[in-house]
Amino acid sequence: MTSNRKNENEIINALSIPAVSNHSAQMDLSLDARIEDSLCIAEGNNINPLVSASTVQTGINIAGRILGVLGVPFAGQLASFYSFLVGELWPSGRDPWEIFLEHVEQLIRQQVTENTRNTAIARLEGLGRGYRSYQQALETWLDNRNDARSRSIILERYVALELDITTAIPLFRIRNEEVPLLMVYAQAANLHLLLLRDASLFGSEWGMASSDVNQYYQEQIRYTEEYSNHCVQWYNTGLNNLRGTNAESWLRYNQFRRDLTLGVLDLVALFPSYDTRTYPINTSAQLTREIYTDPIGRTNAPSGFASTNWFNNNAPSFSAIEAAIFRPPHLLDFPEQLTIYSASSRWSSTQHMNYWVGHRLNFRPIGGTLNTSTQGLTNNTSINPVTLQFTSRDVYRTESNAGTNILFTTPVNGVPWARFNFINPQNIYERGATTYSQPYQGVGIQLFDSETELPPETTERPNYESYSHRLSHIGLIIGNTLRAPVYSWTHRSADRTNTIGPNRITQIPAVKGRFLFNGSVISGPGFTGGDVVRLNRNNGNIQNRGYIEVPIQFTSTSTRYRVRVRYASVTSIELNVNLGNSSIFTNTLPATAASLDNLQSGDFGYVEINNAFTSATGNIVGARNFSANAEVIIDRFEFIPVTATFEAEYDLERAQKAVNALFTSTNPRRLKTDVTDYHIDQVSNMVACLSDEFCLDEKRELFEKVKYAKRLSDERNLLQDPNFTFISGQLSFASIDGQSNFTSINELSEHGWWGSENVTIQEGNDVFKENYVTLPGTFNECYPNYLYQKIGESELKAYTRYQLRGYIEDSQDLEIYLIRYNAKHETLDVPGTDSLWPLSVKSPIGRCGEPNRCAPHFEWNPDLDCSCRDGERCAHHSHHFTLDIDVGCTDLHENLGVWVVFKIKTQEGYARLGNLEFIEEKPLIGEALSRVKRAEKKWRDKREKLQLETKRVYTEAKETVDALFVDSHYNRLQADTNIGMIHAADRLVHRIHEAYLPELPFIPGINAVIFEELENRISTAFSLYDARNVIKNGDFNNGLSCWNVKGHVDVQQSHHRSDLVIPEWEAEVSQAVRVCPGRGYILRVTAYKEGYGEGCVTIHEIENNTDELKFKNCEEEEVYPTDTGTCNDYTAHQGTAACNSRNAGYEDAYEVDTTASVNYKPTYEEETYTDVRRDNHCEYDRGYVNYPPVPAGYVTKELEYFPETDTVWIEIGETEGKFIVDSVELLLMEE
């Protein structure tokens, strides 16, 4: 490309340097001439002495070759790689280990002690001999794997070399010398981890026991974390120690950052990919970090002219340069167009310079929108800008001239020329160079070649094929007389298209995305090979879920893949993964890290999605954070190709691990305590889905193990009928003969489930392998839908903790109780999902209509146990629940047992649950033992107090109930027993506490027997009373039913009672009643008169024989036979027994004795237990209506009436005001 130039006679001082006189100019010209003569000797291809090309070359070469042998490489690849590795680290020339050490020493200006140096070099020399010996033995064995002698030799040398390098590593991290030794340490650690990988690759063939192979593997995992954390820690320490205040210190700081990224952090980022169990086939990794070559500014000025070096030319401060050059974390992008703007610095026709003064760069993330950044001066039109095209081009090399001009005695630093060498990675024949070139006749030039700092991976091929890095961005250091571009580079492994091949695992870093919502790119922790993506919490707003979207390309349309995600979180998080438009995974994942701000190597976890798919599913992979209160970091997505054989082997290995994980490591016939019944069912599904074609024998063997595990699970489960074959209905507490059935119910409850009629048993579905139950909502909280069972005392061990657990498909307002000394309680809301099946799955139904549990589906983590244990309501994102309870001393006679209760008491509530277990967890010791003993004592003390109070309350209530009847046969009421007296007696009966459990008033408590005894007699009294009162609906509880109405009347609720209200004098209510002629009746009315006039209740026959009761607002004393009644005194005609307690008026009968009972609260008030035994208005509401006393002002009157015919009329009316009637009774007298 031809650059545009201006006329040399034009002087454009873009830097606004002040003009000077001709005399001064001439004088300074002579000075400049002398300076120019001195500087000319510095022209040429000079290299900064701080940059050691051989050091960087070795690091780049090793990392590049490792990228080609990740996972499980072919044997030929591995042999070639080890030969290369030995040749790189122990060549015939100068020792690279010494170069590593000296290079870091020079950068940080700290030397190790002579003893440290000599010891390290000597030990490394020994390791080199051992490694070369091992490499030769490995090649010999690979040529003939069946040769016993070769196998014996390689195993012997492997064990010796591994032990040698294990003991050598500490010599490379001497205290206070960790930073200068860091590059040596990283290379040695890399050798050790590669060697440990060989045990997994070849150990079995060499004759190692499987336990030895596993031990080496576990050491590899442990050392991976240890080595990674050490390298990152001391890299950060060394870098922070180099922070300074001026430009020269920034130059050294940047060189350390670049060179140790190449020689240390790039290796560390590849360590996890040596794991052959996670990466069992060839693996493609990518490094997305950015590094910065040195600024294009003169640094080699001769002695005496140091001011012409860019960093001495009034350069910006350290922090200003870092802010201008270092890019904040961002999605990976690629430059597409660079426009360079120029300015002129001219002293004379023989000394002038046009140079790079600003630029505009267009760049784009993969598949994303175009972005633009500008730096420096971009609005100057005096010199035409130069535009360079980079779209689809990798700029693999830059060559730039740093020029210097002198104005008077002031140096001007700038770049008059730069060449960008490129190649199209999709078309290797499209290669060339594009150039920025401006006129320059200055006093010195220095060439900066990026290959000096970032050499190709090998010199055996052309650099356009073997380049290691590509240009990614350009910054600009700006001073008064200074412009120094800084090139930013990414590793070549981070491709432009996120291409996924068919024969290898492909790692796609999340920062290679195109769209990020409610999240951010954050600096990587140092061991990830680049930055990572943080998805924020949504704070309960589902429209605000953090989301990252990454475009992908498949080279094969037929290959099936699985996706794996590497993530980190400090709490359990709910993650959703989509492919194209299909959601393929939604699950609650366990926490992996203690902090997201200081991540360590072991703080990342993997979640593998078993749903296999092809390229037809979509060309986008995305992750959403469904969590309301938790954040998650996404490092990368990994695409694992799935072949029929690979999938069968993978499924078999996964099933074998799952089955073996059911049992303890010390006893393969003993089930682990934390293995749930639901988990066993899911493992059985996993085994059932294994291929009969590839692993029939293994499948049968695994099935036997799973069946055995299921039997063990059933044996330890103390619940009866855990698979829900039958649910019994609620029994009556009274048998036919009226005696309490409490004992039989207590016993029957220990033999299966009891529940309300709306609780249903469902057959297994895509979530449950066996039966499960559903609890629907209810319209009345006093009549909940429930399910319960009692664990009998004979099943329990003294001083032992037990655990209730199970699996909830979904629920809202589900209350769970464990009850012994008191109640342990949780309310669980478990979100469900509309479908377990991704959109790509057409039919989750088997051939016979059964759930197809082998089809790809959304998976919930069966191992995650997340339960609220503070008694508070909580929204679970785990479908598992656990609730534990401690048992103290056991007493078979008392048979306290443990009640297991599930309850829904809201209209919106529901639950689907199954795989319920009640198992022994552990014996109680220490504090837990002391706590349960204290709780047990408190409970017994409370019960003793309760017994004393119950005896007094029961005696009073029994006397009152007995007084309602004529004798102890309880088949006839006393003649003067009225409805208010029955209600009063009933209220006394309900003062008996602990008749039922407050958590579920269908379960008998310790006073159920005596309560039911008296309650049955109250029911008898009501029945006898209803039979005796010949007026229908006399209490108006059914409105105006059975009454004839004239005019406007109403029935109103007042104080929870139904009252007839006659507001007008012309209104009337009447009822015809059948009676027995010649018998005597008592007409009893409770009413209240408002205003003037009278309220009248009249009884009469067709002709004559009329009588009436009149009510006034304030009556004078009226005399009734053997009784009196006064204004606002509603004493009824009770005969001579008016003062007897059973004959007291409503107010007296319902008067509450505040000293009659104690406040029954739970005694087990330990922190982990929840107090639910507080006042509960539904506690004894089993058909009982708690009638309050009639308010003051009501009067009860009665009269005797002897009908002469078989029909009488009851008429209710008034003369004025308002008449309110509570009840009307017509009672047959006893003969």
Swiss-Prot record:
Source organism, top-level taxon: Bacteria
Organism, scientific name: Bacillus thuringiensis subsp. wuhanensis
Primary role: Promotes colloidosmotic lysis by binding to the midgut epithelial cells of lepidopteran larvae. Toxic to Plutella xylostella.
Extra remark: Toxic segment of the protein is located in the N-terminus.
The keyword Lipid biosynthesis appears for this protein: no
Protein name: Pesticidal crystal protein Cry1Bd
PANTHER family, A to Z: ENDOTOXIN_N DOMAIN-CONTAINING PROTEIN-RELATED, PESTICIDAL CRYSTAL PROTEIN N-TERMINAL DOMAIN-CONTAINING PROTEIN
Family: Belongs to the delta endotoxin family.
Keyword entries, A-Z: Sporulation, Toxin, Virulence
The keyword Transport is assigned to this record: no
MF annotations from Gene Ontology: signaling receptor binding; toxin activity
Coiled-coil ranges per UniProt: none
GO biological process, one term: symbiont-mediated killing of host cell
